[in-house]
Amino acid sequence: MGLKEGVVWAAEWGRNMEKKRSERVSFLCSRLALATVAVAACSDGVRPSGRGGGGGEAELTALCEELQMGLTSVLPKDAIPALSNPNFVSPDHRYADYLLPSDRVIGIEIDGEYLAFPHNVLWWHEIVNMNELGLAVTYCPFTGSSMVFHRQNIGGDEFGVSGFLFKNNLVMYDRVGPNSDIEETLWPQMLAEGRCGTSERDRLKMYPALEIEWADWVALHPDTRVVSGETGLGRGGRAYTLYPYGDYEVEDNIATLQPLEEFDDRRPPKERVLGIPYKDGGGIAFPFGALRSVGDLAAIHATAGSADEASALSLPIVVFWDSEAAAAVAYGTTIAGQALTFEVRDGAFVDLETGSQWSIAGEALSGPFVGESLDKIADAYVSFWFAFSQFYPNPVLWLP
């Protein structure tokens, strides 16, 4: 594209952007109205309790009662259209040109195939149903939370966007079908648990994923495929270049759609953290800013869970940090029955026991374990600090 053509295209894109922004402002007004009603439904002030530490049993009960009375249906169900079985293209395909190198993607591996789900697409759709795989890839732009779920709990049915928020977080619903005898259930994303329906209290199993910048994902997996910018829902690839929420993601911006009951001010509200919930209701958070202060790469050993907790999350873990990729990932430290200790050496993750080199994706690049992969802690995910500390109050905060 020449300079003249570029200027013309930029002017056209700017006009379209302003139109989209106006549409999105109207949309946000609906969400703000929804937030006001939802907060009123949750105004009893009872401290959240139970699994996850931030479930808010009394709050959720009140919200369910409001939903059943039809008082909070401000934003229609599926007003934000979830994607189902989108097309995927190679990184160099023209339908992938909506992505910049620094754009964030959720990467997963399925039977040796690598797939990328960009935030750019999920800003607008929030859920991507992968029906053949029985997975739902989800991202809530208001809590910055990336989570991938198995769908066995809902019989493989799809998830849709309910239009409700709980603690500013996406509330999904299961599309059980009009002829089903089963009542649909609401699923607050960061609870990963059913509410207000037949599947009340059912837990969703998470599928391991890696949130990372696009260029670094492609460098790790050049044969990856990515969600096509031509989704067939009236938005061409250029629309996916537009972040629709203005300065919402700025780290120090405390503005949220629903007012925060209280704010844990140990970190900036919109700082990204790698959070790992504890089974007993707590959690541990690794702030990206603190990780960045350690250096370009870091391998941090920790124990994710209570010492007396008989669960996978009480086992030792290691968090790999890559500043350039803006990626933090938690792994188990045992492979093939051997416990490993990691450090950064000569710009690479290395285990002391065998000298094998590992990538940020937990894959051994050289040494005795070449071709092997560490087990990701599937329950670990990236979110904004304010959100993780709302759902898991007073979490352990890792600092160097």
Report residues per predicted region.
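Mid-to-C-terminal functional-domain signal that highlights helix-capping/loop sites
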Residues: 47-400
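C-terminal motif of bacterial Sec signal peptides marking the signal peptidase cleavage site
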Residues: 39-41
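Bacterial N-terminal signal peptides that target proteins for export
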Residues: 18-32
